[in-house]
Amino acid sequence: MKYTIPISQEPNQTFNIDLNGQRCVFEFITRGMSLFMNFTLNDRKVIDGMICLNNVDLVQYKEFDFNGKLYFTDTQGNKDPIFNGLGERWVLIYED
């Protein structure tokens, strides 16, 4: 099943969310015209400074022990996410 994770149009933001019993902390940072992510899973930082790309799984390595798929998708085309379209043009999707 697919779920949309609420995200605001801020250049830098941090939020916590529980995804299917997994404690997740997202930190998104804007550098120039690119969006980067730090990700903490169950109190263990597993990603530090990964660039966010359109339709690319953000937590793709099995050794992270993350259950599911997490990605941004462009609802109006095929561009990589930038902060001023988050939550509208670019939505953050979790698939369990």
For the regions a protein language model found, what residue spans apply to each?
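Short, compact, well-ordered microdomains
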Residues: 4, 75-96
